[in-house]
């Protein structure tokens, strides 16, 4: 099965589970997806360290880097010899994440151009957790001087309430 390494917040945990499900269905057993965090410089340092370690331990596997650190500094991760592909936060929920080695090495768009309404792909459960997470919104419209999140996640966008209810019902049934 594909390996997904999650660094950072609960939203990354949810998104990692979605990517794990899609990568498994696509048969990407030779791939490691690293979902990064950028809330501190230390988080980015740990992401680079994790990438190097995973490549050293699994030299034959493709490494895809995504998440907030990848969104904010795609060129930094693309310059790492260990990295095969860098995917932005808008793109990581697309099936395009799963494209093979012939796809573009960096797929990161302007997060501020994200649509105001969106739905998160449904999942039936969390493979390695006893708690589930349900996304109700993403992004932030505030521009606090100390916070990088609006630039990594984009403007505030809400998930439609009916989608939230359906996701909760699916998770509780499983």
Task: Report the location of each language-model feature.
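Proteins enriched for Cys/Gly/acidic motifs involved in redox and nucleic-acid/cofactor modification
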Residues: 1-174
């Amino acid at each position: 099965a594909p390996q997904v390494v999650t660094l950072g917040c609960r939203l990354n945990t949810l998104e990692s589970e979605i990517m794990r499900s899609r990568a498994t269905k696509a048969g990407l057993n030779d791939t490691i997806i690293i979902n990064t965090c950028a809330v501190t410089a230390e988080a980015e340092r740990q992401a680079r360290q994790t990438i190097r370690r995973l490549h050293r331990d699994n030299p034959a596997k493709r490494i895809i880097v995504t998440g907030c650190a990848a969104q904010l500094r795609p060129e930094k991760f693309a310059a790492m010899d260990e990295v095969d592909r860098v995917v932005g936060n808008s793109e990581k929920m697309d099936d395009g994440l799963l494209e093979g080695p012939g796809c573009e090495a960096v797929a990161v768009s302007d997060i501020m151009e994200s649509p105001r309404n969106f739905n998160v792909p449904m999942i039936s459960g969390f493979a390695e957790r006893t708690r589930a997470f349900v996304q109700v919104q993403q992004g932030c419209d505030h521009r606090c001087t100390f916070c990088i999140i609006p630039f990594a996640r984009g403007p505030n966008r809400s998930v439609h309430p009916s989608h939230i209810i359906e996701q909760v019902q699916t998770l509780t049934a499983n």
